[in-house]
């Protein structure tokens, strides 16, 4: 299975949920937002399985002043 994560091709041997992908890719579990195919997913939907060819964007919140 192939997906795109933050503009990089990622090949997976198995189908993952959004939550599993976040852990596997080493993203922090807090302070991030995840969009799949241009739609931001609330955390309640992170158990959604990713489909082949999905585009995933992970954005980390940054504080500024």
Report residues per predicted region:
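Ubiquitin-like/PB1-type beta-grasp interaction modules and other compact soluble beta-rich domains
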Residues: 1-64
């Amino acid at each position: 299975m192939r997906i795109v994560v933050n503009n990089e091709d990622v090949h997976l041997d198995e189908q993952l949920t959004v939550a599993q992908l976040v852990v596997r890719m080493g993203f922090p579990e807090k302070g991030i937002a995840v969009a799949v195919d241009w739609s931001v997913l609330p955390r309640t939907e992170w158990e959604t399985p990713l489909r082949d060819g999905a585009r995933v964007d992970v954005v980390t919140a940054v504080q500024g002043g």
